[in-house]
Amino acid sequence: MPYYLSILNSIALFLIFPINIFLFIFHHNSWIQTFFLLFLIVFSIFLFSINIFELYLPKKRIITFIEELNNEYSNRLISFHINQEEDIVLLYPLPDHFYKNVPFPFFQIHQPIQQDQNQQLQEPLPGKQYQEQQKHETYTSIDFQPIIETNQYSEPLLSEIEEYTPIDLKEQI
């Protein structure tokens, strides 16, 4: 929550409500109580509208941005979506398709973690093995994050990216 909203909410909760309750208990039907009650109603409507505006405006901008990306890259068989955790996700059919058709900032792949019967983590499968394993799935997804971020999969993925990346993009990496 932005700092100005937290200040306004604090004023409403810790100043206006207690003053109004105090006036209701000790000064029935006073003009001060009426003034504070009207001010409280107007102030609450104002806070509610600002909170709703702050909550939904960024989401609307993100949705508009995703629609523009989908229109621009629709001929490359990739699409952008928001998942349940409200992360922007890029969907594409196969790993080879990703390296040839996805624009530069969308570089980092998160492949699923594979576990054997002993519950030990394994390295993600490279290229063709991963393709064969994913044949039953229509799409593979990646997070909308720059390549700079590191994770446990960064080493094998960077080597895979170097295989498919043109020379001019390697210099930028």
UniProtKB/Swiss-Prot annotation:
User: What keywords does the record list, in alphabetical order?
Assistant: Membrane, Transmembrane, Transmembrane helix
Primary residence: membrane
Q: Where in the cell is it found?
A: Membrane
Q: Locate the transmembrane regions by residue number.
A: 6-26, 35-55
Give a yes or no for keyword Transmembrane in this entry. Answer: yes
Cellular component terms (Gene Ontology): membrane
Q: What is this protein called?
A: Putative uncharacterized transmembrane protein DDB_G0281321
Q: Which organism is it from?
A: Dictyostelium discoideum (Social amoeba)
